[in-house]
Each structure stands twice: as structure tokens, then as C-alpha cells.
């Protein structure tokens, strides 16, 4: 199933930095789910810090923030601790969440092609319905 605005996403088992077990465990509020390529890299750090800096305002508006990458929980814990993030990160080493949201894309770095995460953000309501999608976003001001 291709993810699009208005579609419902499946509830999936997840491995997260805050020990939540299912995607729906985050749905006590609406959810900002952002996918980023890699922990502790300049662009991903900037993006995550901007979410963290805006977190109080985001929560007052009724939203939770959760980041997703293919990094390990150990890597996520280092990332969270180094920058004092106040939101959880999902470890998607199996790519099941990434594939469901269709964020694994062919990329190129120094002429080498590889499959990586396309920086994307999804708004998902409490009923697991996708409200909005931003794909291939720029880091700054995201």
C-alpha cells in the first residue's frame, strides 16, 4: 500500500529509545513522524535540534514528535544523550517502518549509488490516518 494523505497506516511493532512497543503507543496525541538518514551527522543533528527546540510549542498544539532512522538503539541513545533530545527515536534496522512509509530511495554520494532514507515527515492522527506528507525536505527550517 502506498502511503498518501487520507490513508490509514498499519500499526507496527517498533524498537524505540523509550521502550514503546507499537507505533500506536505514541498516539495519545497526534504524531509528527520524521525520517532522517543517520544519527550524529550534521544535517540530521540540525533537523533533530530544530524539532527539540520547538517541542514545547508542538506539544501545546497537541502533537508528539518521534524520529525514525535505521540506526541502532545504542546509536540513538548516544544521539539523544549528546543533544538532550526530549523525544524518542525509533530504530528501524529492519526497514519495516521505512518501507511502509516509502522513504527508502536510491541516492548518490560521490558517484556511488546506494539505498538510503529520503528525509521525510508525516503527520499522523490518533486513528493512524495520514494528514500530511513532506518528502525530500531541506534540513534547515524544516
Mark where each language-model region is.
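Chalcogenol-based redox active-site neighborhoods
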Residues: 1-142
Amino acid at each position: 500500500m502506498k502511503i498518501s494523505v487520507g490513508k490509514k497506516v498499519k500499526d507496527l511493532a517498533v524498537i524505540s529509545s523509550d521502550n514503546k512497543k507499537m507505533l500506536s503507543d505514541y498516539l495519545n496525541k497526534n504524531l509528527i513522524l520524521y525520517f532522517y538518514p543517520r544519527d550524529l551527522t550534521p544535517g540530521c543533528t540540525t533537523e533533530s535540534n530544530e524539532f527539540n527546540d520547538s517541542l514545547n510549542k508542538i506539544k501545546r498544539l497537541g502533537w508528539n514528535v518521534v524520529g525514525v532512522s535505521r540506526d541502532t538503539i545504542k546509536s540513538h541513545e548516544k544521539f539523544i544523550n549528546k543533544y538532550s533530545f526530549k523525544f524518542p527515536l525509533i530504530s528501524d534496522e529492519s526497514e519495516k517502518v521505512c518501507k511502509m512509509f516509502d522513504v527508502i530511495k536510491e541516492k548518490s554520494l560521490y558517484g556511488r549509488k546506494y539505498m538510503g532514507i529520503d528525509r521525510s515527515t508525516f503527520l499522523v492522527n490518533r486513528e493512524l490516518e495520514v494528514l500530511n506528507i513532506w518528502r525530500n525536505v531541506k534540513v534547515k527550517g524544516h
